[in-house]
Amino acid sequence: MSLEQKKGADIISKILQIQNSIGKTTSPSTLKTKLSEISRKEQENARIQSKLSDLQKKKIDIDNKLLKEKQNLIKEEILERKKLEVLTKKQQKDEIEHQKKLKREIDAIKASTQYITDVSISSYNNTIPETEPEYDLFISHASEDKEDFVRPLAETLQQLGVNVWYDEFTLKVGDSLRQKIDSGLRNSKYGTVVLSTDFIKKDWTNYELDGLVAREMNGHKMILPIWHKITKNDVLDYSPNLADKVALNTSVNSIEEIAHQLADVILNR
């Protein structure tokens, strides 16, 4: 009970006391005095009740403001929580992508190391050395890209005097595909990689690329990349190292232009 409420209760109690003190024996003058006192007390009580009413209204206003502020605070907390959830999901997604890229790089290094080991063992086991042909350029590509680009490129390079290792020119019926590819990789001065969406899906093309990377890891810079109907983001996702190399692009250069630029590098023109 507040102080004002206590005052009001005391006044009502006094009014009741005065009313109870009025009896049949009360003289007219005393009755008049008591009635006047009751009237004053009632007026005082009315003022107190009015003040209490004002205080109650103010309290309700304050409570409403506090409730509204609390609701706004809850909304802000919910919004911040959602923002944090979105940020956390993005960070998790970025971390997963980073781990995938890291795994691809590790797998490539493992494959390159295995390739070096396989080649070393193969060389050791071949006690009678065979003379293998040498090539200026090894062309690594997906079969889906032969018709529209790779075959015309290989033919144009030959016309320019470049000795090309290209499966249609080199492989014969009965040849071991893996042995011939290993021989071509070992005995080529340079290797051009025709990067396309089909290329990155193939096991054989990845095997060939691992062989070229292994050569480069031994200090021989030889990879000459060509982007064919592929975006930079695709290449970045596949191999950040390849994406960092200066590449020719079939969307910018014609087959003849690409062939001449390759020949200039290979033949030191």
Swiss-Prot record:
**Site positions for Important for ADPR cyclization:** 204
Tell me what effect the entry lists for residue 175 to A.
2.5-fold increased NADase activity
Enzyme's top EC category: hydrolase
Q: Which GO terms describe its molecular function?
A: NAD+ nucleosidase activity; NAD+ nucleosidase activity, cyclic ADP-ribose generating; NADP+ nucleosidase activity
Q: Which GO terms describe its biological process?
A: NAD catabolic process; signal transduction
Query: Which keywords does UniProt give here?
Result: Coiled coil, Hydrolase, NAD
According to its UniProt record, the EC number is 3.2.2.-, 3.2.2.6
Quaternary context: Homodimer. In the presence of NAD(+) analog 8-amino-isoquinoline adenine dinucleotide (3AD) forms filaments with 3AD between monomers; conformational changes occur upon 3AD binding.
The UniProt function text for this chain reads: NAD(+) hydrolase (NADase) that catalyzes cleavage of NAD(+) into ADP-D-ribose (ADPR) and nicotinamide. In addition to ADPR, also generates a cyclization variant of cyclic ADPR (cADPR), termed 2'cADPR (v-cADPR). Cleaves NADP(+), but does not cyclize the product.
Establish whether keyword Cell cycle is in the entry.
Answer: no
Q: Name one Pfam family in it.
A: TIR_2
Annotated effect of mutating residue 182 to A: Slowed NADase activity
Please list the residue ranges annotated as the TIR domain. Answer: 133-266
Question: How far does the signal peptide extend, from start to end residue?
Answer: none
The record lists the effect of residue 208 to A as: Loss of NADase activity
Q: Which reaction(s) are listed as its catalytic activity?
A: NAD(+) = 2'cADPR + nicotinamide + H(+); NAD(+) + H2O = ADP-D-ribose + nicotinamide + H(+); NADP(+) + H2O = ADP-D-ribose 2'-phosphate + nicotinamide + H(+)
| Catalytic residues as annotated in Swiss-Prot or TrEMBL | 208
Residues where NAD(+) binds = 143, 172, 202, 245
Instruction: List the InterPro entries hit by this protein, alphabetically.
Output: TIR_dom, Toll_tir_struct_dom_sf
User: Outcome of residue 174 to A?
Assistant: Loss of NADase activity
NAD: is it a keyword of this entry?
A: yes
What UniProt notes about the protein's domains is:
The TIR domain mediates NAD(+) hydrolase (NADase) activity. Self-association of TIR domains is required for NADase activity. The TIR domain alone is active and produces cADPR (residues 134-267).
Task: Give start-end ranges for the coiled-coil region(s).
Answer: 31-99
Give the protein's recorded name.
2' cyclic ADP-D-ribose synthase AbTIR
